[in-house]
Amino acid sequence: MFERNQKTIFVLDHTRYFSIASEEYISMDFLKGKPSADGGATGAAGNASGGGGSQFSKSLWTCACESSIEYCRVVWDLFPGKKHVRFIVSDTAAHIVNTWSPSTQNMSHVMNAMVMVGVPSRNVPTSSDYSVIHGLRAAIEALAEPTDEQLAAMADLGTDELPRIPNKGRVICITSARDNTSMKSLEDIFNTVLVQQNALAAPPAKKGLVIDHCHLVILNIVPLGVESLVTNRSLLKISPLLDVEIHTVSAPDISYKLTHLILNHYDLASTTVTNIPMKEEQNANSSANYDVEILHSRRAHSITCGPDFSLPTSIKQGATYETVTLKWCTPRGCGSADLQPCLGQFLVTPVDVTSRPSSCLINFLLNGRSVLLEMPRKTGSKATSHMLSARGGEIFVHSLCITRSCMDEAPSITDGPGGRVSDYRTAELGQLIKMSRMLPLKVKDPSAPPLTRRLPRYFPLTTSSSILFHLQRHISWLPHFLHLLVKEDMDKQDEVRCQQHIHELYKSASRGDVLPFTHTNGARLKLSKAKDQYRLLYRELEQLIQLNATTMHHKNLLESLQSLRAAYGDAPLKSEPGASLLRSYTESPLSPERLEPNSSGSASGSSNSNSLLKASKRRMSSCGQRSLLDIISSAERSQSNKRLDFSGRLCTPLGQVAKLYPDFGNKDKDTVASGASITPNVKEESVRS
């Protein structure tokens, strides 16, 4: 609730040094005169070279005041009444500009107070009494003061639970130091005062709230063109209570630096609306395109973009942060079908509130108009991702849904990889989930079946991959029969009923009745003979009973079915115990690995079915008889048998050394043209057993 950005305190250095010019000169144009030769803002070098018009330069104090007040304006525009900003001016003492009270948390109060403070005087003699340390001490004391929200929380919790109130804050100090040593001294003093303040806030004194953590940001500003001896430093943890970061920036660029910092301090994002058509100020008959930069919550972009969209970003001249570029969309009439759902709305404030393009855009929105913003996709097309509109005198950015909406129809499961599959057993899967629901018990029941027994044993995902579950829609007694097979507490009466149903299947097979298939979903169930259909049915039924055979009644059913299969001429082969469990519980005799679509015609359907059945039975029976080591060893032996072994190993007795080149060096020396003697080079290799 009480985050670190809820309390922010600006400490402004009001010493004599801040009365000097920032060295960024601005030309003055008069209505009846001509503009200066420089034609705008120039630097110190341009001023030295001379110019035809009048120029002036802001002081360091003016640059610091304008940028800090603009910082708090953005905070109060985007978080009205939720985030608090205070100002403290430091010279010979600390001057409190405003408090945590809502009556002083507004632009009018702060600006009137800053006018009364004024620019530091250059005629004041240099003295050690003028220091920014006075303001830093007052800032720590201000952090210990509770806000109205903290007071309300303390009233709810009671006085005995005050340490439970979180109290964090941030101090932004705008000053100017000589070197890193002076900056290090400033950090040490701040850390010491922070520890002392927490000691005063602890019992029994209880003077204010304990400061849990403080983030100190020091901005070391210098005139334009002046190099500073203070080194920039990223966020560094000084103590468990204090984090410090240091930035050295020229006075004209301090506004860009504070805008960059506020993005991280309050989790904001910058958006630049480009190509805004606007009439020229001096020529009403022509128009030009302008850009306006706005600030808002970062979530306005994060909740809109999906994986198929990218945010186009750019960096403004003079700035160091990125801004998202969105294009002005020309208003056009659209029906309800063209409107996207809104994912969220967030307050908006312009970066430069006094510029003419910002003023025109604000007035356009406050008059009841809305603006759609476009963003390009990766493919090059554009999508309307945001909308600007105003309500109640406040401007909002609406994040529009550019991906699939929750109100859209869900994508069909048949559109996934692997082609269209339309016979998923969705309803049966839901019933299975309800039946398999487990609840924790305080006391373990010793008579309860083990956990693995209650898990689903066999569940084909599609109807076309199973004969047994495909027929339950057409044979009336089959659903009840399947329910009895998976019962955990099957009794003798259930066993008798199942025996009767199994004998009915045997009688139907003896009469040659064709199983009632109405929907085959391809060619998987297109078997030319009823005998092949019953064989597959018996095999799947045996697999189902075998996976659930935990009671004596299940085992009796399994033996009865196996005897019927033997009488039918389809006796199962003996296999190792548990070998069938190596197959997936979602596979069936009609899975693609077991039975492929028959494309050879009806004449060869019977032979192909028989061969597939035999191959499937061989795979199921041989599964588990060979280990992975046996398979790899067999492959290595088959490869080694294709090559002849080294003759030295074959001809040399075990334990002796074989010569690698036995005939090398035995040729007549006369045959050598050079007549030089050849030294035999004999290499030996030991024979490994």
From Swiss-Prot:
Assigned GO CC terms? cytoplasm; INTAC complex; integrator complex; nucleus; perinuclear region of cytoplasm
Q: Does the keyword Nucleus apply?
A: yes
Q: Where can this protein be found?
A: Nucleus; Cytoplasm; Cytoplasm, Perinuclear region
Reported modifications of this chain: Phosphorylated.
First-listed, main subcellular location of the protein, grouped into a coarse class: nucleus
* Alphabetic keyword roster: Cell cycle, Cell division, Coiled coil, Cytoplasm, Developmental protein, Differentiation, Meiosis, Mitosis, Nucleus, Phosphoprotein, Spermatogenesis
Question: Low complexity composition bias: which ranges?
Answer: 599-614
Which residues are in coiled coils? Answer: 521-550
Q: Name one GO biological process term.
A: snRNA 3'-end processing
- Region (Disordered) spans which residues? 578-619, 662-689
Write out the residue ranges of the motif Nuclear localization signal (NLS): 613-619
| Matches recorded under Pfam families | Mat89Bb
Entry superkingdom: Eukaryota
Q: How does it assemble?
A: Belongs to the multiprotein complex Integrator, at least composed of IntS1, IntS2, IntS3, IntS4, omd/IntS5, IntS6, defl/IntS7, IntS8, IntS9, IntS10, IntS11, IntS12, asun/IntS13, IntS14 and IntS15. The core complex associates with protein phosphatase 2A subunits mts/PP2A and Pp2A-29B, to form the Integrator-PP2A (INTAC) complex.
Q: What does this protein do?
A: Component of the integrator complex, a multiprotein complex that terminates RNA polymerase II (Pol II) transcription in the promoter-proximal region of genes. The integrator complex provides a quality checkpoint during transcription elongation by driving premature transcription termination of transcripts that are unfavorably configured for transcriptional elongation: the complex terminates transcription by (1) catalyzing dephosphorylation of the C-terminal domain (CTD) of Pol II subunit Polr2A/Rbp1 and Spt5, and (2) degrading the exiting nascent RNA transcript via endonuclease activity.
Q: Could you say which protein family the record assigns here?
A: Belongs to the Integrator subunit 13 family.
This chain belongs to the protein called: Protein asunder
Species: Drosophila yakuba (Fruit fly)
Taxonomy, top ranks, is: Eukaryota, Metazoa, Ecdysozoa, Arthropoda, Hexapoda
Gene symbol here is: asun
